[in-house]
Amino acid sequence: MKYPLVPLVNELTFSFLVFWLCLPVALLLFLLIIWLRFLLSQDSEENDSDVCLDWEPWSKNPDEFCQEEMLHSQEEERPCC
């Protein structure tokens, strides 16, 4: 017996199978998007006060920043009496 007596996929069952096979994938994708949006909104609410970036070095020229770093390193090397 080469072929089944009743074919699984034909004109009548194709749309039914596509619907029931794609529905779980679509629902999982939808729930994943909702869950990620919830996590991202929760993270931004909790950590608003924790974020403290020092933008001053980025606003300076690289030469000024390097000179300032050299001054700080020289101050640290000097022993305090």
Swiss-Prot record:
Give the record's keywords alphabetically: Membrane, Nucleus, Transmembrane, Transmembrane helix
Q: Which GO terms describe its biological process?
A: brown fat cell differentiation; positive regulation of fat cell differentiation; spermatogenesis; white fat cell differentiation
Q: Induction of this protein: by what? A: Up-regulated during adipose differentiation of four different kinds of preadipocytes prepared from subcutaneous, perirenal, mesenteric and parametrial adipose tissues.
Give the principal location in a single coarse category.
membrane
Superkingdom classification of source: Eukaryota
The UniProt entry's coiled-coil ranges are none
The record's listing under InterPro entries reads: Adipogenin
Membrane topology note? Single-pass membrane protein
A cellular-component GO term for this protein: lipid droplet
Q: Where does the secretion signal sit in this chain?
A: none
TM spans (from-to)? 16-36
Localization recorded for this chain is: Membrane; Nucleus
All disulfide bonds of the chain are: none
Tissues expressing the protein = Highly expressed in subcutaneous, perirenal and mesecentric adipose tissue.
Q: Which PANTHER family match?
A: ADIPOGENIN
The family annotation for this protein states: Belongs to the adipogenin family.
According to its UniProt entry, the function of this protein is described as:
Plays a role in stimulating adipocyte differentiation and development.
The name this protein goes by in its record: Adipogenin
- Write down the species: Bos taurus (Bovine)
- Supply the source organism's classification: Eukaryota, Metazoa, Chordata, Craniata, Vertebrata
